[in-house]
């Protein structure tokens, strides 16, 4: 089964997450099919902390992919932010 989840990167005490579409049997930071965005929880004020390709997330969910709970929350928040800005 394909899932969209966060793969951790960055260094110690400074996490950075890539939002990836991957097979559920792969390791958290292992092989993935496609990178659909990123999340930086410790971003400074001037830099971008979240970017998601909503059309690619929509494509994967239409193809049967499941969203992890954390990614589901981020997608919901990001789509609300994008629609408010438009």
Curated annotation (Swiss-Prot):
Q: Which GO terms describe its molecular function?
A: structural constituent of ribosome
Question: Which keywords does this chain's UniProt record carry?
Answer: Ribonucleoprotein, Ribosomal protein
Q: Which GO terms describe its cellular component?
A: cytoplasm; small ribosomal subunit
- Where does the UniProt annotation place the signal sequence? none
Output the GO biological process annotations, alphabetical, semicolon-separated: translation
Q: Which Gene3D superfamilies match?
A: 3.30.1320.10
What Pfam families does this protein map onto?
Ribosomal_S16
Family the UniProt entry places it in: Belongs to the bacterial ribosomal protein bS16 family.
Q: Which HAMAP family match?
A: Ribosomal_bS16
The identity of this protein, by name, is Small ribosomal subunit protein bS16
Q: Which gene encodes it?
A: rpsP
